[in-house]
């Protein structure tokens, strides 16, 4: 990281210990914020507003930033699996890593009911379900390699089918708790555990983006 970036982050960093959430990009943050409104409604606004953007799958950046934090800080870094089947980085003291079981966080938005509610699709329109049945993997190994970003892209198959881009954050908000995949519940379980270890005053930790 350039020296100027380190200085900027140091100026913004609070002196007291804090809980820091690291995510790959703004889209990840918006999806997590939507899920958090359902799973962590009292903590979502502060925590997700102040999540640190890494600018891609860059666990080393999270470690570098976290090492410069105040003693006693805790953190969770949430990463896509991408194409690496063994992608779980080594934990750093106080900083945990969570890697999605599927290739991308967007994979967990491919819930027909949530997409239908988010787009207010008429009940007589069954094109969505037919397309997902044809496109989606049948087993976990298939999901680990499946490119959900392609399917959900602004000009991807679903957008062309439905005649409009898919609003990913709205789909995340429309996903009911019992529709969320076990991986999502596991990640939020890790998040709750970390938050319980910190006083409430330390939830906010505006740190800027590491882009």
For each of these PLM feature ranges, what is it?
Residues 1-211:
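Acidic, divalent-metal-binding catalytic cores of TOPRIM
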């Amino acid at each position: 990281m350039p020296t100027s970036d380190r200085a900027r982050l140091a100026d913004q960093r609070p002196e007291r210990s804090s809980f820091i959430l690291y995510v790959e990009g703004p889209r990840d943050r918006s999806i997590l914020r939507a899920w958090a409104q359902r799973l962590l409604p009292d903590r979502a606004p502060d925590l997700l507003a102040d999540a640190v953007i890494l600018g891609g799958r860059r666990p080393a950046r999270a470690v570098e930033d976290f090492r410069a934090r105040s003693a006693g800080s805790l953190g969770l870094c949430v990463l896509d699996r991408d194409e690496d089947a063994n992608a779980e980085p080594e934990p750093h003291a106080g900083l945990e890593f969570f890697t999605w079981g599927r290739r991308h966080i967007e994979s967990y938005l491919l819930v027909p009911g949530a997409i239908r509610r988010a787009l207010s699709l008429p009940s007589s329109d069954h094109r969505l379900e037919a397309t997902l049945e044809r496109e989606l993997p049948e087993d976990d190994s298939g999901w680990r390699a499946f490119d959900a970003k392609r399917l959900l892209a602004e000009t991807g198959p679903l957008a062309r089918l439905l005649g409009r881009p898919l609003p990913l954050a709205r789909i995340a908000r429309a996903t009911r708790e019992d529709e969320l995949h076990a991986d999502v519940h596991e990640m939020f379980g890790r998040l709750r555990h970390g938050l319980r270890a910190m006083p409430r005053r330390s939830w906010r930790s505006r740190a800027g983006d590491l882009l």
